[in-house]
């Protein structure tokens, strides 16, 4: 795991009020050799803001990042699967034409060794051996695949123009069967648009769509474990609106990327010692690192919070739009036969407010933090097992509780994998040398045969 800070400037002519920000980090490259991994990617950002004339404007931005991560004593040959999330983001109007963006990126890199365990099987004829059984996991396949999904959403009749479309992909289930990996999930989509009234009031439409993708994999093994990340390539997301008898229909194309590593499990029977009564032998022992997938769990969780706007003179009149664009897991801790998962979901909310001091109404926005803590049951864990976790949004609902308070209720999907790193010493080679000299013991026994005296 590693954290990186990133800054960028976004051109936003005549900006006055930031209304909504959707930022999606995508890891485009994760490879290396020895003990270093190079990661590269982009943060796609879309900013909806109100300019000094009261016009709603949208700007897009791409900010690149790169880093080198020291993973220690990794295997000579390895594949890696990386995930990156925004653990914090801050936007502010730097000048009349520029918005300053500050990101904090969290990287989580899983390294899968491609070197096979070196061992001698327990069929060495003429040797006295001490066998042992070791359960290990092996990398079967790792790849990045591109695919696309398309859906339609009915926006209704009161639509002037679409301003923003943000979407996140959530993996719900992964299975390996035959020579294929099946990835199932949902796309959570939120469209912000202007209405046809004189004030160009904002409105939004949220929708959820199922997706299912199958990919061919090498060295398939039924019941294998799979580690999967799915991204929406936000810079290429397309929305085409069609007016059908006065009602607006939005056609949305989602270019997507799936990164996966498929891991199988096998039990090997090897030797921890060997000796011979007839020959001189040379035994080579090798200490080897192996890993084993202990278990995994996918579970949906309900989370909620209550937020109060900071300005005392300001009251909430109407909520226009809300969506969760980012969830950061701050803690994954083993607690007996369970995993304690803690984190924060960030919800962007656009609403109309009234200021009693100025006696003016206007659009404003907040990013509300929804903290959560839950325990997921997972048996057979050791205290030093490694937990690989991520969280994705499923749905969110925001309602006005009082004039200055909002209730937020959301559902998120938690994906937890437990991996155990093991070190074992196995006999990796046996060389049989010269025959030992015949026995010259001082005491001999002679057994009298039948008919002898």
Residue ranges and their predicted role:
Residues 1-453:
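Viral structural modules
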